[in-house]
Amino acid sequence: MTRPILIAGYGSIGRRHLRNLRALGYKNFILYHTGKSILPDDEILDIPTEHNLAKALAHKPVATIITNPTALHMSVALAAAKAGSHLFLEKPISHTMDGVEDLRRLAKRKKLIVQVGFQFRFHPLLRKIKRLLEENKIGPIVSVQAHWGEYLPDWHKGEDYHLSYSAREELGGGVLLTLCHPFDYMRWLIGEIDSVSAVQSRSGGLKIDVEDSADVLLNFKSGAIGNVHLDYIERPSRHFIHIIGQNGIIHWDNSKPKNFDRNRLFIDEMRHFISCITKSEQPLCSLNDGIATLRIVLTAKQSVKEERLIKLI
């Protein structure tokens, strides 16, 4: 690829993707950021930087890696797609459905690759679980539970978590959006979801203006039922999935095993994205997948407000 790759947003995940692309051998980048990041600039001194999106897109990037706050994703994605740039869109794809269908139509018309950053689809054990389920090793699925609790102030050492997008409603924060991975990998593993019921809490302990815990009940179209628990409170952190089938169970715990680097997931998803562009492959996690997960989250939020079970549209 001779055209540059645009990194739109230079927070912690933008820096990770930049490092990983460099590790994969790519050297031609453009950086678009507002200058509000508190990360040091030493790694980007050699990268042309624009503070205006139109100027950044004037460099004609072959791909745009969208890593700015959730509430700003869609405006950048639409502009980049109009410019003919393939998209790697961090999760969640947005905080509302505004502009989402426009992006879907635009990407289809321009034949653009759009991959969504749900990196757990690249976890070797979750991929093994998917194979086991496809082989019907535990029979029909009866119930599935996912639990993800992680203390928000510990996420990025040296940063004020109050200022992060995860903690701010206007930037698309809160556990339902920020920790939405289980909704994606449950769809991927178990199948489509029919209806959602949710409750949430703003406990006040973290002094943030978004929900810091939530529980979501899911009815799958297959007849299976599920539960997702998310929180910003739990210490030590815990993340697992427990699947009950008619003939057995599967339990996966995300506690770090020996000799496993979680950055492998991010390397593999970025390698896959580049391969999709250069070899015309289809993304393992497509824009349609990202839209489906966003609908689940927004339906959960609606359920909280209306205090009832709601069918997905």
Indicate residue ranges for each PLM-predicted region.
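C-terminal helix-rich "cap/oligomerization" subdomain common to oxidoreductases
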Residues: 63-66, 135, 221, 275-313
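Beta-loop-alpha module in the N-terminal Rossmann-like domain of NAD(P)-dependent dehydrogenases
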Residues: 47-106
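A short helix->loop->beta-strand "cap" motif at the edges of active sites that frequently abuts
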Residues: 26-27, 83-85, 110-113, 224
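Contiguous beta-strand/loop segments that form the cofactor/metal-binding neighborhood of enzyme cores
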Residues: 177-256, 267-280
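N-terminal Rossmann-like dinucleotide-binding module
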Residues: 1-44, 59
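Predominantly a Rossmann-like dinucleotide-binding segment in NAD(P)-dependent oxidoreductases
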Residues: 120-207, 307
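Hydrophobic residues in well-ordered beta-strands that form the structural core
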Residues: 89-90, 114-116, 252
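Rossmann-fold dehydrogenase core element
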Residues: 102-120, 140-144
